[in-house]
C-alpha cells in the first residue's frame, strides 16, 4: 500500500504543461502547452494569436546541431529533438515563398511578416541585392515606417540610426552616410500617399525578382564527388556552382519532375522526360535529406495549387481583404478630408486677426500720408507768403525807379557832360525798371502757382482724412457663410465571394502547364521593364563613386548578368535538354 501511495504521489507531481517561447520577426510570445500537444496544436495556437489565416507559407523552426529543422505537425512537440530546458524556443518564420507576392499574399499580417523576413535576409546579406535596388528598397522601408515625407519633421540626419543598406553596399562606394541618406530620401519623397501595407508590398515586388530570393541552399556532392549547391524554391530545383549562387548550372521546374526520393544520404530526382537521365547526389547528413524532401513536397504542392482555381477559403479571404482595403481607403480619405477641414477652420479663425492687422497697417500708412500732406501744405503756404512779399517789394522798387527816372528827366542839366551822364543814368534806370517789372511779373506767376499747389495739397489732405475715416468705420468681422464640403461617393460593398483568376487544368497536362508558365514569364518581364529603368537610372548616378577593388564575387557576377540582360530571376533558369539518353554533366 505504501509503495502504491508513493507511486500515486509521484505521478501527481509530474508537470502537465511546459512553456514554449515563440519568436517572430518583431515580437516574442510565451505559451503554456500540454505535454500531449502535437506540432499542429502549437502551430494553430500561434496562428490564432497572430490572426494569421494563410498558414501554408509558415512553420516553426528550430536548430539541431547547427542544422535547421521544422516542427512536424503530426508529431508531439516534445518528441522532436529539441532542448528540454524551458522555455522551449521556436522561431515562427516563412517556410515557403510565393511566386507573385502581390497576387498570393492576401492578409496584411502575412505581407508584413514576409516583408520583415525578406528585409532581414537582404540586410544580413543572405540574399544578394545590387546597390541600386538596395537604395530603392530602403526608401520603401522608410515609407513603411515613417509614413509620408515631411521636410519639417524628417530633417537631415533622421535616418542616421536606421539600418537600411547591406554593409557590402556601403563599403563598395566612396559615399558618406549623409550622401546615402540624401539618395534614399529623394526616392522616399516620391512614395507620398502610400500606406504601410502598400509600401511593404512594393518592397516585396522588387525583392522577389532577386536571384537568391526564396532559395534554400544545401551543400551536395555528385557521383564524381564534386561539391555543388542544391537550391530549392517556389519554381523548382536548381543546381549551382558553389562560387556562383546567382545563376544555376541546371534547373528542374516542378512541372517537369516525376519523382523525388532519398535513401540514406543519396537523393534522387527523376525528370518527367524519360529521355533525360535520373540525377543523383549525396548530402552530408540524413537529416538534411529529410529537410530537402519536406521543402520539395511543400513547394511542389503550392506550385500546383497556384495553377488551379482558388479554394473557397482563399476566395473568402480575398473578398474580405478587398473589403478591408476599401474600408481603409475610405478611412484615409475621411482623415484627409478632416485634416483639410481643420486647416481651413484654422485659416478662417486666423482671418479676422489678419484683417485687423491689415487694417491697422492701412491706417498707419494713411496717417503717415496725411502728416506728409499737412507738412507739404504748410511749407507751400509759407513759401507762397514769402514769394508774395518779395513780389510786393519788387513792385515797390520798380515804382521808385520810375519816379527816379521821371525826376532825373525833369532835372535840368546844363553841361553836355552832365547831360550825357544823365542820359546814361536814365538808360540804366530804364533797363533796371524793365528788369524789375519782369521779375515782379515772374514772382507774381510763381505766387499764383504756389497758391494752386497749396489748393491741391489741401485737397489731398481732405482725401487722406476721408480714407482714414472709412478705415476706422469699416467692420472688423465680415459675415462668412461656410459651405459644407460634399461627402465622397459611397464605396460599393463587396460580395463575400469575389471574382478570381482561374488556372484550372489537370496535373498530368504538363505541356499545357509549361506553356502557361512561359506566358506568365513574358507578362512578368513586361511589368518589370519600368522598374528596371528606375534602377538603371540610380545605378548610373552612383557608378562613378564605386570602389572597384571592393567588389565581391557576387557583385562581379551580377554586373556580368546585367550586361548580358540575364539578371532577372526568371532569366537565370536553365532547363536540362533532352538529347538522347545522355547523362547530365555538372
From Swiss-Prot:
Subunit structure, as described in the record: Interacts with NHERF1, HGS and AGAP2. Interacts with SGSM3. Interacts (via FERM domain) with MPP1. Interacts with LAYN and WWC1. Interacts with the CUL4A-RBX1-DDB1-VprBP/DCAF1 E3 ubiquitin-protein ligase complex. The unphosphorylated form interacts (via FERM domain) with VPRBP/DCAF1. Interacts (via FERM domain) with NOP53; the interaction is direct. Interacts with SCHIP1; the interaction is direct.
Domain FERM: 18-307
Modification(s) after translation: Ubiquitinated by the CUL4A-RBX1-DDB1-DCAF1/VprBP E3 ubiquitin-protein ligase complex for ubiquitination and subsequent proteasome-dependent degradation.
Compartmental location: Cell membrane; Cell projection; Cytoplasm, Cytoskeleton; Nucleus
Name used for this protein in its record: Merlin
Reported function: Probable regulator of the Hippo/SWH (Sav/Wts/Hpo) signaling pathway, a signaling pathway that plays a pivotal role in tumor suppression by restricting proliferation and promoting apoptosis. Along with WWC1 can synergistically induce the phosphorylation of LATS1 and LATS2 and can probably function in the regulation of the Hippo/SWH (Sav/Wts/Hpo) signaling pathway. May act as a membrane stabilizing protein. May inhibit PI3 kinase by binding to AGAP2 and impairing its stimulating activity.
InterPro entries per record: Band_41_domain (IPR019749), ERM (IPR011174), ERM_C_dom (IPR011259), ERM_FERM_C (IPR041789), ERM_helical (IPR046810), Ez/rad/moesin-like (IPR000798), FERM/acyl-CoA-bd_prot_sf (IPR014352), FERM_2 (IPR035963)
Any one Gene Ontology molecular-function term assigned to this protein's record: integrin binding
Modified residues (Phosphoserine): 9, 514
The keyword Phosphoprotein is annotated on this UniProt entry: yes
